[in-house]
């Protein structure tokens, strides 16, 4: 369970997230809003990429201020641009890096890497140069790099924005099939059809928190204002 208690945030005294309290328990949660609405700030607060200016973010009881490393072990984060996460020249090296930091036995490292590569049909690319992967393959590698660490929650920030339709569908399927809780910031409303809950942000405020049909109705109405 992720809990926000009276959380707010600002940049240079400009409020970007107004006081917010809520609890996230559902397995699939979408987050939408126009550019600058506060949705990406909200996402980054969930795994301690940002710390709140005020209030508390608790992940299974861990406070992001007091134990940010512990929170990041529980909450993985997938960026919009996979190049922000792919730092090694070979696919296998990229997946192994975080696991070696955990000081796992070599057999466990090998098993985890094999598992994620098989899941996303990347097995034949194990020794492939990372920069030669397609856009969709890079995003799947970024997701694999998070999942190989076995977090309990995964936050996605616009995971399909840079992809063509074919690769968008591959990444959308990967998100749907995740065993972990997924919290997805997106403009791709079709991605959210089967989600349990959608949060709508506008100008730093949460203006809707409902099942997809109701939340997206509010979002579309706001987006079509004159």
From Swiss-Prot:
Binding site for ATP: 33-40
Record flagged with keyword Nucleotide-binding: yes
Positions in coiled-coil regions: none
SUPFAM superfamilies to which the protein is assigned, alphabetical: P-loop containing nucleoside triphosphate hydrolases
Pfam families recorded: ABC_tran
Any one GO cellular component localisation term in the record: ATP-binding cassette (ABC) transporter complex
EC annotation from Swiss-Prot or TrEMBL: 7.-.-.-
Keywords: ATP-binding, Cell membrane, Membrane, Nucleotide-binding, Translocase, Transport
GO molecular function: ATP binding; ATP hydrolysis activity; ATPase-coupled transmembrane transporter activity
Subcellular location: Cell membrane
Main location: membrane
Ranges of residues in domain ABC transporter: 2-225
UniProt topology in membrane: Peripheral membrane protein
Physiological role: Probably part of an ABC transporter complex. Responsible for energy coupling to the transport system.
Sequence similarity: Belongs to the ABC transporter superfamily.
Protein name according to UniProt: Putative ABC transporter ATP-binding protein DR_2469
Protein species of origin: Deinococcus radiodurans (strain ATCC 13939 / DSM 20539 / JCM 16871 / CCUG 27074 / LMG 4051 / NBRC 15346 / NCIMB 9279 / VKM B-1422 / R1)
């Amino acid at each position: 369970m992720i809990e926000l208690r009276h959380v707010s945030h600002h940049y240079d005294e400009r409020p970007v997230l107004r006081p917010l309290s809520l609890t996230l328990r559902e397995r699939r949660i979408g987050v939408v809003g126009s550019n600058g609405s506060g949705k990406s700030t909200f996402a980054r607060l969930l795994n301690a990429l940002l710390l709140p200016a005020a209030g508390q973010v608790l992940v299974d009881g861990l406070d992001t201020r007091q134990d940010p490393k512990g929170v990041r072990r529980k909450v993985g984060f997938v960026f919009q641009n996979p190049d922000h996460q792919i730092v090694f020249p070979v696919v296998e090296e990229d997946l192994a890096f975080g696991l070696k930091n955990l000081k796992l036995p070599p057999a466990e490292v090998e098993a985890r890497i094999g598992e994620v590569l098989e899941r996303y049909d990347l097995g034949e690319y194990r020794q492939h140069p990372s920069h030669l992967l397609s856009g969709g393959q890079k995003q799947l590698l970024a997701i694999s790099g998070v999942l190989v660490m076995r977090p309990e929650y995964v936050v996605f920030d616009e995971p399909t924005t840079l992809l063509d339709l074919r690769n968008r569908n591959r990444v959308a399927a990967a998100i749907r099939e995740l065993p972990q809780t997924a919290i997805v910031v997106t403009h791709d409303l079709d991605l959210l059809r089967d989600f349990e809950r959608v949060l709508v942000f506008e100008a730093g405020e949460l203006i809707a928190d409902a099942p997809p049909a109701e939340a997206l109705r509010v979002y579309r109405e706001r987006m079509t204002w004159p």
